Every structure is written in C-alpha cells, then in structure tokens.
Curated annotation (Swiss-Prot):
Residues 175-199 are annotated as: Disordered. This is Growth arrest-specific protein 2. The gene is GAS2. It is a peripheral membrane protein. Cleaved, during apoptosis, on a specific aspartic residue by caspases. Phosphorylated on serine residues during the G0-G1 transition phase. It holds the Pfam family GAS2. InterPro entries: CH_dom, CH_dom_sf, GAR_dom, GAR_dom_sf. Its main location: cytoplasm. It comes from Homo sapiens (Human). One of its GO terms (biological process) is initiation of primordial ovarian follicle growth. It is found in: Cytoplasm, Cytoskeleton, Stress fiber; Membrane. The modification Phosphoserine is found at S183, S187.
Amino acid sequence: MCTALSPKVRSGPGLSDMHQYSQWLASRHEANLLPMKEDLALWLTNLLGKEITAETFMEKLDNGALLCQLAETMQEKFKESMDANKPTKNLPLKKIPCKTSAPSGSFFARDNTANFLSWCRDLGVDETCLFESEGLVLHKQPREVCLCLLELGRIAARYGVEPPGLIKLEKEIEQEETLSAPSPSPSPSSKSSGKKSTGNLLDDAVKRISEDPPCKCPNKFCVERLSQGRYRVGEKILFIRMLHNKHVMVRVGGGWETFAGYLLKHDPCRMLQISRVDGKTSPIQSKSPTLKDMNPDNYLVVSASYKAKKEIK
C-alpha cells in the first residue's frame, strides 16, 4: 500500500502557533517513549516482583534502590548459568552497596545510582548506553535510562535471563535475517499482495497509522508490505513488529522507534519548515527536501527526533 499523507490535515496544532506546536512535539516524544517504558516496566515487574508501570517508571527507579536490586537479581541468574557450565567470563559477581530507603532526590539516591552504573560498566555496558546519575534522580533522561536497561536485557539474554519484549523481537529479526536471504524487489503484480492481509493485526495497524491523516497529496509516501513484518517505507526496507499486540515498532539501526514517530521523522509531508525571519511555519511541499530546495531563511523541523529541530544552514 502506498499512502498519501498531506500536510493540509494534521493531528497536531495549527501551523501558525509555534509555541503550541513545540508543546505538541514534546507530547509526541513522550508518546514515542511510552512503548519502551511499558515493556521495561513489565520486565522489571517480573524480575523483581515489584509492580512497576509506564506511568510510575521513573518514580519507582529514581532512588536507585530497585536498580541495585536488579543488578543483584541478574547476578543470581548469572550464577545459575555458571552452575549450568555456561560461559560467564568477566561477569561481575559482587555485593552492590545500596541504601534501600534512600529518599528520592537525595545524595543517597545519587550514590545508589552511581553504584548501579559502576556495575553496568563492569558488566560491559558501553558508555554510550549509560545515563547520568542526575538524569535518573531528577527525571531528566528517561530515554537514556530506557536504553541502558534494554542493553542490560540484551546482555542478560545471553545467559538465559528472560529479556524484555523488544529484545525478543530483535532476536526474532536476527534469526529471520540469518535464515533467509534478502528477497528481490516485488514485481508490480505482487505489490498488492499486502492488501489481502487485512485480517492481520500488524498489517491493519500499519495501514491505519500510515493513512492517518488521510489526504489527496500528489506526492505519495510509500508504505508497502513486502512480506510478514517486512515493509518498504519510503526508500528503505524495514522490519516492523507488534509489541505486546499493542504498539507498532520499527527496527532502526541498533534500536527501536514507534512507526508513527518514524513517519513523523521521514515522511516529507509530515515535516515543517520554519522561517527564521517571522517564525511562521509551512509544510514541506517537495517529495524529498534538499538544501537547494530550502529558503536560506528557513529551517526544518523533524518532529520525531528527540532534538526538536534540525537546522539546514
């Protein structure tokens, strides 16, 4: 399916109110993070036996105590792997200092978090996947906290620890890539095959998201089903999966993004250019905006990025 997505009908605020639009972008960024929080909250609840939800995610973790408990729990799982003669080379097996009653925002909360981050480094978590202690304690880096926990899930999965749902989907895609060679581009006669899968939950969700809002835009941004869970989106071929039968997620690079967020970032019809002179906003009209197409007095807003603006100088 190739859908037409027009800047004329938007689910966001009017184009003339930049302040309102900025607030809308912030809400979109939070919406993009929600599936990851839900997935990790479920994972932590199962591992630690403490109820955590997406809404309470940062509040439950911000004194560092549950993270230290997570580290201790994972070490116990590593010991079980060691007993089963699985390789556990360089895995940290130590007591992690922790003040369980540390008040949120306190020095003790920062100390707990620092001890957890030190353990992560010993485990082999790359610095690029870590967050700052202040980022957790003051709730400034929810995305970085999520990415760190996902990386822990990847490492833990190697030793038999049940990983988060997103990591399971990653393994599924890796197996699919290993077992099957890339298929050739579909012929014109086969492009409509995806339309027959209307009963499929993922296909229906992809269609619904890609066609919202509907329009009659002449420059169509292509969203085309190639095979189960594999789509052509614009000029790229992407793996798309359903997380917990609820969220439509796109595998991008080494991570994940919501499908709606990906479209906001890559579909030219969903981008805005903003005048440096008067602050007025206007949609991108061309199929693929480039430097030569842009007025030097304008800059481009890419609404799915956590950096709310991209400047083209």
